[in-house]
């Protein structure tokens, strides 16, 4: 194996170690509470630990942490993690949680051209939510049915923030105080996960911008040997956007493969939508037409991916193709795609 190949494998294994460290915490409301408090506190090191560990959470847990993560929008040292973690949340579910939180924060900044406003606007544009930018400064945009959330302070300033009353902060989600031993175990797991993520980032640093690394990962993802696919996908979390974007066509091939889930979907969702869309959409439809062995569930998987990103027109295209497919099972799945994603 080449030196580049060995480095990719090492990065992938370190990311696996990071995920294994928090594996017992997945779906654990107490763990979400600890992460939320760390993100809400003044300790930047703890907050970074929480952000790094959050890459391995279930979607539900990550969604519960959105208000706490959003408190770090505009903090440059956390910017890359904030953008990518929020991108991993399906946009249909992210929108109603994130936008009011950002709007509440901006009510504290009178300057419409200030750095926080620019950071919030840039984040929404990256997520494909540019239609929501107006709501950030429009006091009437919340509507009359749902009041805006309480204004959070900056992380650690003691202001009333999401962690005071929302999932991800305060008491554990079930309302019961966890034992000190349980909380200590959670904190240890989070720190261990963050430790491995930092090691992975350090090991991946020489690979960033290296065309040989991108070419090798692309080659490994273009085969079905099963030897290096998971290492490649895990290592890709540590690549910069430009390198990850170059791998989109190769990653697309794995979207409907259960044994590597959820890595393909999450990697694609981490990218800025304006750059992702012109690469992703042709790759998806080319792959759907190319692979004659796709079953009906594969069609649903790709529709689900595009729905997660917010590409409704492309979901409609998949449904239309499925509805006219020669396979009756695929045609039936086309109807399910319409019912699941396009009814509202």
Kindly give the residue locations of the regions a language model identified.
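Disulfide-bonded cysteine-rich modules in secreted/extracellular proteins
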Residues: 3-14, 104-106, 186-193
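Amphipathic alpha-helical scaffolding segments comprising HEAT/armadillo-like alpha-solenoid repeats
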Residues: 28-37, 60-71, 94-104, 130-137, ...
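Short inter-helical turns and helix N-cap capping residues of alpha-solenoid HEAT/ARM repeat scaffolds
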Residues: 42-43, 113, 225, 294-295, ...
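Helix-driven interaction modules
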Residues: 108, 116-117, 285-322
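Eukaryotic acidic, Ser/Thr-rich intrinsically disordered low-complexity regions
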Residues: 125-148, 316-344
């Amino acid at each position: 194996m080449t030196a580049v190949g060995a480095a990719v494998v090492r990065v992938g294994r370190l990311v696996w170690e990071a995920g294994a460290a928090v594996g017992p915490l997945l779906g654990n409301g107490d763990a979400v509470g600890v992460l939320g408090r760390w993100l809400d506190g003044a300790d930047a090191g703890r907050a970074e630990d929480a952000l790094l560990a959050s890459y391995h959470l279930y979607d539900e847990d990550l969604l519960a942490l959105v208000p706490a993560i959003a408190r770090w929008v505009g903090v440059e040292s956390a910017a890359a993690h904030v953008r990518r973690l929020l991108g991993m949340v399906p946009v249909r579910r992210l929108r109603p949680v994130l936008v009011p939180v950002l709007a509440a924060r901006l009510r504290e900044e009178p300057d419409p051209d200030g750095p926080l406003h620019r950071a919030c606007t840039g984040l929404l544009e990256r997520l494909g939510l540019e239609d929501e930018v107006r709501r950030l400064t429009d006091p009437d945009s919340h509507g009359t049915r749902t009041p805006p959330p309480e204004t959070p302070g900056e992380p650690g300033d003691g202001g009333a923030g999401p962690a005071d009353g929302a999932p991800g902060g305060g008491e554990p989600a079930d309302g019961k105080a966890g034992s000190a031993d349980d909380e200590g175990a959670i904190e240890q797991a989070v720190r261990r996960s963050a430790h491995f993520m930092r090691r992975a980032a350090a090991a991946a640093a020489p690979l960033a911008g290296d065309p040989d690394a991108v070419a090798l990962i692309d080659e490994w993802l273009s085969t079905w040997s099963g030897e290096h696919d998971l290492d490649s996908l895990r290592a890709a979390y540590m690549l910069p956007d430009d390198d990850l974007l170059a791998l989109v066509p190769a990653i697309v091939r794995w979207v409907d493969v259960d044994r590597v889930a959820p890595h393909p979907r999450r990697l694609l969702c981490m990218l800025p939508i304006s750059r992702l869309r012109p690469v992703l959409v042709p790759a998806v439809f080319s792959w759907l037409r190319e692979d004659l062995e796709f079953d009906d569930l594969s069609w649903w998987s790709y529709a689900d991916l595009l729905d997660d990103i917010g590409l409704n027109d492309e979901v409609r295209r998949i449904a239309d193709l499925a509805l006219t497919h020669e396979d009756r099972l695929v045609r039936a799945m086309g109807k399910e795609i319409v019912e699941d994603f396009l009814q509202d």
